């Protein structure tokens, strides 16, 4: 067993999660990850592989530097979260996402960058790749960031740049942008969204059914 003894109260020491090539699907070795992220402000001295990797990236909910990369649909996959005060949270996390649109009202997003199933609304980000990979059935809406990437804590504002498209699928994800993709009853919300409107997405992360705030990194 290898381990480090580290004074986490030292202001110069931090815990960070980094993604290989800063996207979900790249396969990069642990030594190469810090090597590609080292700079005068970030010198890495220890690292560990944080999760198993599948076709959609890490299996579990993943956040890095305050950005939500992916969420796990259920509660059966354990993870460790790090908050802004360097406190660790462990357990089986579950994340909810609230969508608020001036034209479509309020709705729930099932997950981020996950495989879309029946009667689900999924939010895809450009961290997944260039397209959603969805089949034809359903409705998809393209958007760009108003105030940065999808936050793991707090509200993210987005603006619709591609009006609702029905029964085509595999929509291109705008650079540094998003696609809302839904099937079944969730399409009732998406078809009401309009080109140029600004909407909000707000996550809430639960560890073992307890809402946890200020999570910046998790896997």
Predicted regions and their residues:
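Hydrophobic beta-strand core residues of beta-sandwich domains
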Residues: 173, 190-193
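Generic recognition of flexible, low-complexity loop/linker segments
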Residues: 34-35, 188-189, 210
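Short alpha-helix capping/helix-loop boundary micro-motifs
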Residues: 178-191
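Short, Lys/Arg- and Gly-enriched loop/turn segments at beta-strand edges
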Residues: 204-217
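Loop/turn positions that initiate beta-strands
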Residues: 193-200
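Residue-level recognition of well-ordered beta-strand positions that form the cores
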Residues: 5, 202-204
């Amino acid at each position: 067993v290898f381990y480090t003894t580290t004074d986490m109260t030292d202001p110069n020491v931090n815990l960070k999660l980094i993604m290989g090539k800063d996207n979900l699907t790249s396969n990069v070795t642990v030594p190469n990850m810090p090597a590609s992220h080292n700079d005068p402000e970030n010198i890495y001295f220890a690292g560990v592989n944080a999760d198993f990797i599948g076709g959609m990236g890490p299996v579990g909910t993943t956040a890095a530097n305050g950005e939500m990369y992916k969420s796990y649909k259920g509660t059966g996959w354990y993870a460790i979260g790090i908050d802004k005060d360097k406190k660790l949270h462990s357990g089986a996390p579950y994340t909810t996402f609230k969508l608020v649109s001036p034209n479509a009202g309020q709705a729930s997003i099932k997950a981020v960058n996950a495989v879309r199933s029946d009667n689900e609304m999924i939010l895809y980000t450009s961290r997944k790749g260039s397209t959603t990979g969805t089949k034809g059935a359903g409705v998809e809406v393209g958007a760009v960031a108003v105030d940065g990437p999808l936050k793991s804590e707090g509200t993210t504002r987005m603006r619709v740049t591609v009006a609702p498209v029905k029964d085509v699928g595999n929509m291109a994800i705008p650079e540094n942008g998003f696609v809302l993709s839904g099937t079944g009853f969730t399409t009732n919300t998406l078809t009401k969204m309009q080109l140029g409107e600004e909407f909000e997405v707000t996550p809430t992360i639960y560890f073992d059914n307890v809402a946890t705030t200020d999570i910046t990194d998790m896997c």
